[in-house]
Design a protein with these regions (language model features):
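Juxtamembrane helix-loop-helix connectors linking adjacent transmembrane helices
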Residues: 55-70, 82-153
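Transmembrane helix-loop-helix hairpins at the membrane interface
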Residues: 8-22, 115-132, 139-245
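Short, solvent-exposed coil/turn linker segments
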Residues: 19, 48-49, 92
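Alpha-helical transmembrane segments in multi-pass membrane proteins
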Residues: 2-11, 24-87
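Membrane-interface helix-boundary motifs at transmembrane edges
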Residues: 21-35, 93-102, 166-175
Length: 245
């Protein structure tokens, strides 16, 4: 089973990460954040060679998850587990997370609108490319599971970049919200370099889209908090992986 192979592949890295964390003092939040982001990148990029997801061909970007609901469910639950773990073991990072700011309804609507804006450039490009050349159709029965992994997986990613990193920039470095959101987007794009050029051959397309999406999520975060940013990122990924575009 692929999910078993994936978990076995992660064990050495997770063991090393655990040892490193235990050697660090709880008062070293920046080192915690570096370790958490490294673990995320390693767990995300390990999905590709096993076929748990597919990301484009050549320089053309499209995304599809594996067509296995059990695997998608396990991956989504694992992402939530990582979020709970990080929040529990690094309280100095946890206090930096603002789940909502301002009007919640406006935040949710803005997060949804952000997802539409994020995928709009690719949607326009896709109009001239047959569906079978960009991942193919997706069974309707998988859509709830894809939505779950898109939201839970990107909660894991967003709490790192728009939760901890953004919070550190605004609270500790005293950077204003909008610049902090844009900086988080730059870091987010940088976190895709290995995926773009070493794990896949999609290259610059991944970095450009990650920068665009990351900056949008950062701007949403700067005004409305983390959950709306998760909606922007997670729903954008859902739209790209669902075959609905």
């Amino acid at each position: 089973m692929l999910i078993t192979e994936y978990l076995l592949l992660l064990i050495p890295g997770l063991v090393l990460a655990t040892i490193l964390f235990l050697l660090l003092r709880r008062t070293h939040p920046l080192l915690h954040l570096f370790l958490f982001i490294t673990v995320f990148i390693f767990t995300r990029d390990a999905m590709t060679p096993l076929g748990l997801w597919s990301i484009g061909n050549g320089s053309f970007l499209w995304i599809r998850f594996i067509h296995d609901p059990v695997t998608l469910l396990i991956l989504g639950l694992s992402s939530l587990g990582f979020v709970f773990l990080m929040q529990s073991i690094s309280p100095e990072l946890a206090v930096l997370v603002e789940w909502f700011e301002g009007n919640r309804v406006a935040g949710i609507l803005t997060g949804i609108a952000g997802a539409v804006i994020a995928v709009l450039p690719l949607a326009l490009i896709y109009r001239g490319v047959p569906l079978e050349n960009r991942g193919g159709t997706v069974p309707l029965r998988l859509l709830p599971f894809i939505l779950f992994i898109a939201l839970s997986g990107n909660l894991y990613e967003e709490i790192l970049f728009r939760g901890y990193l953004y919070g550190w920039l605004t609270e500790r470095e005293r950077i204003k919200p909008v610049p902090a959101g844009l900086i988080s987007g730059l870091f987010f794009s940088f976190g895709h370099v290995f995926l773009a050029f070493n794990v896949t051959d999609v290259g610059i397309s991944i970095l450009v889209f990650a920068l665009w999406e990351g900056c949008l999520a950062g701007l949403v975060r700067s005004r409305f908090g983390l959950i709306p940013a998760v909606l922007t990122h997670g729903l954008a990924v859902f739209l790209l992986t669902s075959g609905l575009l």
